[in-house]
From Swiss-Prot:
The active site is at C129 (nucleophile). Belongs to the dihydroorotate dehydrogenase family. Type 1 subfamily. The keyword Chloroplast does not apply. This is Dihydroorotate dehydrogenase B (NAD(+)), catalytic subunit. One of its GO terms (molecular function) is dihydroorotate dehydrogenase (NAD+) activity. SUPFAM superfamilies: FMN-linked oxidoreductases. It comes from Oceanobacillus iheyensis (strain DSM 14371 / CIP 107618 / JCM 11309 / KCTC 3954 / HTE831). Catalyzes the conversion of dihydroorotate to orotate with NAD(+) as electron acceptor.
């Protein structure tokens, strides 16, 4: 069965990609399976300089998902270009760089840096990380700022730009429209929902950062609703994510309005989850009367 999907800058052999921050730069996972099986890889965030991230503890399990406040730990954009991208480029898969910053200038610098390499196929612009003190969140919650940073990155980069939206907003459609107007080639949605967990013996927040981003199956219905709403109003492609653990979840995302998907937290529970989903997808599509990914995308106008 044909699982391929064509998106701006991306010829995906299948619509499954590990989500940013849940796959590092693929090194550890490459010991489990051949990364060429994946539609693409969404790399961990890149900032201008190396970041050590937030103090620990910075991850916690909750009764319905996972909280994290990693704080964009990464070795800095030049290290990523010099060492991580060449290692990933050996695989026959698309590479998407996730870029972050605490100022417009930093986003511009990081976006322009990736022009050095043709091995990166597209940028995912993270305007939505809730766990960095300086800036970050203001780009993801204010349509004016989101538009501005998208415009600057589009101008600085020679690659298609997918803007990753935060669910921590009142009106997701307004955010999506703002970045579409600014020239975004696609959307990536959603990032984590801000949450908190209390450590009972100390009566303090369990995560050192106090709050963290909630991910995993708990956020899937929120993501599906937001993608559905945005799909009605915006015409650029959407890479959907949030709590995907199975091929059925992928189909739900595609029908709601996504064009491809990313799998995040589930990789921590089952390192083979992306390959398992890719293997199961043809049977699940067939079961629900579809004969390709394109077929689902074409027919969803009727179903939704
Ligand atoms: C540990 C962890 C680190 C993450 N780091 C990033 C990141 O660096 N950049 C980014 O855009 N999103 C990051 N995310 C968000 C994920 O890419 C994804 O949008 C979110 O977790 C929802 O998908 P999921 O429920 O499948 O995990 C991170 C998520 C987790 C759990």
């Amino acid at each position: 069965m044909n699982l391929s999907v064509k998106l701006p800058g991306l010829n995906l052999k299948n619509p499954i990609m590990p989500a940013s921050g849940c796959f590092g730069f693929g090194k550890e996972y490459s010991e489990y399976y051949d990364l060429s099986l994946l539609g693409g890889v969404m790399m961990k965030a890149a900032t201008q300089f190396e970041r050590l991230g937030n103090p620990t503890p910075r991850v916690a399990e909750t009764s319905a998902g996972m909280l994290n406040a990693i704080g964009l730990q990464n070795p800095g954009v030049q290290q990523i270009i010099d060492h991580e991208v060449p290692r990933l480029a050996k695989y026959d898969t698309s590479i998407i760089a996730n870029i972050a910053g605490s100022s417009i200038e930093e986003y511009e610098f990081v976006a322009a840096s990736f022009n050095q390499t043709t091995d990166v196929d597209a940028l995912e612009l993270n305007i939505s990380c809730p766990n960095v003190k300086e800036g970050g969140i203001q780009f993801g919650t204010d349509p004016f700022m989101a538009k501005k940073v998208t415009e600057v990155v589009k101008k600085a980069s020679n690659k298609p730009v997918y803007v990753k939206l935060s669910p921590n907003v009142h009106n997701i459609v307004e955010m999506a429209k703002a970045v579409e107007e600014a020239g975004a080639d696609g959307l990536s949605m959603i990032n984590t929902l801000t949450g908190m967990k209390i450590h009972l013996p100390s009566r303090k927040p369990l995560i050192a950062n106090k709050t963290g981003g909630l991910s995993g199956p708990a956020i899937k219905p929120v993501a599906i609703r937001m993608i559905y709403e945005v799909r009605q109003q915006v015409s650029i492609p959407i890479i959907g994510m949030g709590g995907i653990t199975s091929a059925e979840d992928v189909l739900e995302y595609l029908i709601a309005g996504a064009d491809a998907v990313a799998v995040g937290t589930a990789n921590f529970q089952n390192p083979f989850v992306c390959v398992d989903i890719i293997n199961e997808l043809p049977e699940v599509l067939e079961q629900y009367g579809f004969n390709s990914i394109e077929d689902v995308i074409e027919k969803r106008g009727i179903t939704v």
